[in-house]
Amino acid sequence: MALTDERIGDTDVESTENTSTTMRVRKRNGDLEAVDVNKIVRAVERCADGLPGVDPMRVATRTISGLCDGATTEELDELSIRTSAAFIVEEPNYSRLAARLLATVVDKEVRNQDIHSFSQSVAMGVEQGLIGPEVAEFVATNARKLNDTIEDERDHLFEFFGLRTVYDRYLLRHPENRMVIETPQYFFLRVACGLSTCPDEAIRFYRLISSLAYLPSSPTLFNSGTSHPQMSSCYLLDSPEDSLDGIYKRYTDIAKLSKFAGGIGVAWHRIRAKGSLIRGTNGLSNGIIPWLKTLDSSVAAVNQGGRRKGAACVYLESWHSDIEDFLDLKENTGDPQRRTHNLNLANWIPDLFMERVEKDWQWSLFDPAKVPHLTDLYGSDFESAYLKAEEAGIYERQIPARELYSRMMRSLAQTGNGWMTFKDASNLKCN
């Protein structure tokens, strides 16, 4: 579309011509040059090809009107992308236009580092310590075949939000200049190579995920083919031993898994309850809450490689005598030192508890320091051990089962947390 299109009046033509003579942009090398209005218009028109309902001239003129003298070319590119995205509420195809404009920016960023093929992208990653040795050798051995596999036009399948997320969080970046060293298609093929044993397998998988018909989980996308190929989404950890060494070792385990985008599920049943005797110091325990507060801060600090917040869920048995304090952890009121806003919470419920809820019977709460064996039992073995401990009178206190169940339901309704998970059903089906 020419700049003198009938939809642009004489005044607009004159104003854009004046812009081209008075406005300048700063190139990557620092030089200033006059704004080339026609170049901006042509760039938007190319990306708008085949998108019904999209007016490229509208985007171009709005972009030009938003320029300031001395803006960098990167700021100009970002302005055109944001301008397109602003029109998405009027016409959904502007999302694809914004995505295509962003794709050209990504491509330019990669090529400005003298990366013109998939194998060169991987070589750069190897040089910077980002790519694992097995994938490096795999790509070097099959470079020509893998390079020929890339289908750049598949970038056009992205909507804007999807491609922006890929650009911001998933593409590998140079450790020093923070520029991306792979395009979306290089990224997909790198993931495929990390999951494959031969070139044909990698190519088939690349074609599947680059078509967006299927995508692996985020940790796989983050880490496949890299020097830290931790690709599982979730890790379930047993309760730490009831000691300083045991608790801090579990903190370390969780931090290392979270570092490479693993979500954590961890039990906390073995840690002694509030008021329990600490024989080493002859003091009394503060219970599980201070430990979970520390874990909450750790999860927030180790933010999955800077890509997103860490995620962890703590499970607690319903017979633990700190269960009521546990259910208050996500409340928005109360002592902030006894609240954990980053952790997720889950109740680990035996069938015996639900039977007592149904019958409106009492439920006994125990200090795990006195009944350490209950943690590892389920089904009939748990029931007999629980009843034996109850008959021996070693519980801390008793409450109506329905009262505790009501607190669980209230916590779940008010905070969306305190998930209901069933110990016996889970173990009987999995073990």
Q: Could you say what each language-model-derived stretch is?
A:
Residues 2-431:
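Extended catalytic cores of very large enzyme megasubunits
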